[in-house]
């Protein structure tokens, strides 16, 4: 539901809460949340991460814009659960307390301007994914996206950049067919 329709605007004007599906599910569910957004690649990344996590843990839920509503699984979640959630800009508009342990913004390119009206507003809404994250949380950002590279310099959660085209001083990058994690102290091959 667009947040600028008269009914929703009147709720905001009256100080009434306006929760979307993601906010309701987050408040109802348990466990840690890994949330993925971006203009392109969300579904593929969410499915891949969901598979990796499902192979490593017992209680994993892959939900959100990927097709399974977050709310449909929220009551099944336990403290030990991991939720991998694909989150769209539309879903981010109505978050209030939603706070993923790890967030990722894959990229931001011009899209949904019929809803967000300007590129600046679209970027602002995408960046809401870190709104409630703390310094104990992580945000994974695409180093090749100039908007995200700059955004990462000014956010509360720990920033981890990734790149498929260059070696990074710190972050995750491709080196030939090798995925490498480089920290200040070491270089760790992750997948070959």
Question: What do the predicted segments below correspond to?
Answer:
Residues 77-161, 165-168, 172-175, 180-181, ...:
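Flexible active-site lid/hinge loop adjacent to a nucleotide/diphosphate
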Residues 1-35:
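Short, basic phosphate-binding NTP loop
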Residues 50-55, 72-76, 153:
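Short, well-ordered alpha-helices that flank and scaffold nucleotide-derived cofactor binding pockets
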Residues 32-38, 46-47:
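ATP phosphate-binding P-loop of adenylate-forming
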Residues 58-70:
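Short beta-strand-centered segment that lines the nucleotide-binding/catalytic pocket of NTP-utilizing
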Residues 18, 33-34, 58-60, 157-159:
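Hydrophobic anchor at the start of a short beta-strand
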Residues 44-61:
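A conserved segment at the C-terminal end of the G1
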């Amino acid at each position: 539901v667009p947040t600028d329709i008269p009914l929703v605007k009147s709720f905001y004007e009256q100080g009434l809460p306006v929760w979307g599906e993601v906010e309701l599910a987050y408040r109802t569910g348990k466990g840690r949340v890994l949330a993925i957004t971006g203009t392109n690649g969300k579904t593929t990344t969410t499915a891949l991460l969901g598979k990796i996590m499902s192979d490593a843990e017992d209680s994993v839920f892959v939900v959100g814009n990927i097709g399974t509503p977050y709310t449909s699984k929220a009551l099944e979640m336990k403290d030990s659960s991991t939720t991998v959630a694909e989150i769209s800009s539309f879903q981010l508009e109505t978050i209030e307390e939603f706070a993923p342990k790890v967030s990722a913004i894959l990229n931001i390119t011009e899209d949904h301007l019929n809803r967000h009206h300007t590129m600046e507003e679209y970027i602002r809404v995408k960046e809401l994914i870190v709104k409630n994250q703390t310094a104990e949380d992580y945000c994974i950002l695409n180093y090749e996206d100039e908007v995200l590279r700059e955004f990462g310099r000014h956010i509360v959660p720990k920033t981890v950049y990734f790149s498929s085209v260059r070696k990074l001083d710190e972050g995750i990058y491709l080196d030939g067919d090798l995925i490498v994690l480089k920290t200040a102290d070491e270089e760790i091959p992750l997948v070959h």
